[in-house]
Amino acid sequence: MSLEGVFNEGFMTTSYDSVVNWAKTGSLWPMTFGLACCAVEMMHAGAARYDMDRFGMLFRPSPRQSDLMIVAGTLCNKMGPALRKVYDQMSEPRWVLSMGSCANGGGYYHYSYSVVRGCDRIVPVDVYVPGCPPTAEALLYGIIQLQQKIRRTNTIARA
């Protein structure tokens, strides 16, 4: 959290945006949308070795309880409407992280008739994590990048 000024002892000033964005970054609740092998690496990142809990992340099974969707794996044409439906059920503010080359652009199956060439054709994506499959460290780096992006946003609309 960036502080604009410190006056006397124990008194500090900051903006409302900074406080709200700091709280948002410390309480991301991701929902897993595991479609293929990238989901295994996502589960690996949630286990004890990498411990996503230290970032304030708690995996939620329901889209109504989560504010981050991690799309991991190959998105087929039949799964596209389900992805959009789950995204629409999430409450605002909501973010999407695309994990792996298949979710980013179709991957090895790019020219297949049944594969969506990137989940950004269905939902807006905030952060892309490259790799096939990306490592757990790459996923954590993508989450940190998303947290930095959230800190830079304005909460209050200015005239």
UniProtKB/Swiss-Prot annotation:
Keywords linked to the UniProt accession: 4Fe-4S, Cell inner membrane, Cell membrane, Iron, Iron-sulfur, Membrane, Metal-binding, NAD, Quinone, Translocase, Transport, Ubiquinone
One Pfam entry name: Oxidored_q6
Cellular component, GO annotation: plasma membrane; respiratory chain complex I
Top-rank taxon, per record: Bacteria
BP GO terms, sorted: aerobic respiration; electron transport coupled proton transport
An example molecular function term from Gene Ontology annotations: 4 iron, 4 sulfur cluster binding
EC number: 7.1.1.-
Keyword Electron transport: no
Gene3D superfamilies: 3.40.50.12280
Broad class of where this protein is predominantly found: membrane
Reactions it catalyzes: a quinone + NADH + 5 H(+)(in) = a quinol + NAD(+) + 4 H(+)(out)
Function: NDH-1 shuttles electrons from NADH, via FMN and iron-sulfur (Fe-S) centers, to quinones in the respiratory chain. Couples the redox reaction to proton translocation (for every two electrons transferred, four hydrogen ions are translocated across the cytoplasmic membrane), and thus conserves the redox energy in a proton gradient.
Subunit (UniProt): NDH-1 is composed of 14 different subunits. Subunits NuoB, C, D, E, F, and G constitute the peripheral sector of the complex.
Name of the protein this chain belongs to: NADH-quinone oxidoreductase subunit B
Organism the protein comes from: Polaromonas sp. (strain JS666 / ATCC BAA-500)
